[in-house]
């Protein structure tokens, strides 16, 4: 890959390209057949940052995405054009960013896993044109309570929308019959995390909440509860860490404090729950 950067005043522009030559081969030991496939692709990208002030900047970019189909596959390559536009703030102990994103897929690939019972593992399927868009928000802030004690907080949230742009019948079990405008499965609308930490010289006490909205497990546009779906959930975790030395630390965690129970997936073999309330101890050594 290669990147060229140009700077004019408070604006920086990066123009890049990545080139890949892919040689693939698949052997069928039952039939003795060997299939070879050669692919070459160049993916360009362009991004820019505009420093509005010492604390505020605006950034954006356009990037070509690519995921090759396997050498023995009848599926087309996965290709996409990805856009982002955002604003970033940083001042002393505060950092924040807001980013909008949009991914325009010319073709989406679905890949059969070993756990999928109605397709051959490794087989690939065309999903046609797909659009995925959303907004990401992040916020970090720290307050010095004393020379040796601080309070740190963070918040991260992602909102995502998705839809198929064509109607088709697929042998991929996660898709099946897809109608134009259907939302994609396994892309939750809302995902987030909130974290609060009390930090001393050699110790840290932290509480965090991970949350996720209900999630489709089959394509559709009707009420999500009218079809196969996973539950929404909010899980509280607590942890305490103590540094014995610069490299060695001990940590105790109470995960899923409230013992929240939720079905997180119905595939591959029926409903699966999240982790129940658990106590975990760790010894960490950093090299």
Which sequence ranges carry the predicted segments?
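Gram-negative outer-membrane beta-barrel transporters
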Residues: 7-10, 22, 125-220, 243-249, ...
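Outer-membrane beta-barrel translocator domains and adjoining extracellular loop/strand segments
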Residues: 25-32, 69-76, 108-116, 160-173, ...
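Outer-membrane beta-barrel "beta-signal"
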Residues: 86, 138, 273-287
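Membrane-embedded beta-barrel scaffold of Gram-negative outer-membrane proteins
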Residues: 10, 51, 57-61, 77-146, ...
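Structural signature of Gram-negative outer-membrane beta-barrels, strongest in the C-terminal barrel
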Residues: 1-105, 197, 245
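Predominantly the C-terminal beta-signal and adjacent terminal strand-loop region
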Residues: 257-279
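Membrane-embedded beta-strand positions of outer-membrane beta-barrel proteins
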Residues: 4, 15, 46, 60, ...
């Amino acid at each position: 890959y290669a990147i060229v950067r140009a700077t004019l005043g408070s604006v920086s522009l990066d123009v890049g390209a990545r080139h890949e030559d892919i040689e693939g081969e698949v052997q069928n030991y039952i039939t003795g057949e060997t299939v070879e496939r050669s692919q070459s692709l160049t993916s360009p990208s362009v991004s820019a940052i505009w420093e509005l002030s010492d604390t505020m900047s605006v950034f954006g970019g356009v990037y070509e995405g690519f995921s090759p189909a396997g050498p023995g596959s009848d599926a087309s390559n996965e290709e996409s054009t990805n856009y982002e536009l955002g604003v970033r703030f940083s001042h002393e102990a505060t950092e924040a960013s807001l980013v909008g994103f949009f991914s325009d897929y010319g073709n989406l690939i679905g890949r059969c896993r070993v756990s999928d019972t109605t397709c051959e593992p490794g087989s690939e399927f065309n999903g046609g044109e797909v659009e995925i868009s959303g907004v990401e928000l992040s916020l970090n802030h720290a307050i010095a309570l004393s020379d040796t004690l601080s309070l740190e907080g963070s918040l991260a949230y992602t909102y995502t929308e998705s839809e198929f742009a064509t109607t088709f019948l697929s042998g991929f079990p996660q898709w099946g019959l897809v109608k134009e405008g259907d939302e994609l499965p396994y892309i939750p609308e809302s995902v987030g995390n909130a974290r609060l930490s009390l930090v001393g010289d050699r110790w840290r006490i932290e509480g965090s909440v991970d949350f996720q909205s209900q999630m489709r497990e089959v394509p559709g546009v009707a009420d999500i509860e009218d079809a196969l779906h996973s539950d929404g959930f909010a899980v509280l975790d607590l942890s305490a860490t103590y540094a014995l030395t610069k490299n060695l630390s001990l940590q105790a965690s109470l995960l899923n404090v409230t013992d929240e129970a939720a079905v997180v997936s119905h595939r591959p073999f029926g409903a699966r729950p999240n982790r129940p309330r658990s106590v975990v101890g760790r010894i960490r050594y950093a090299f």
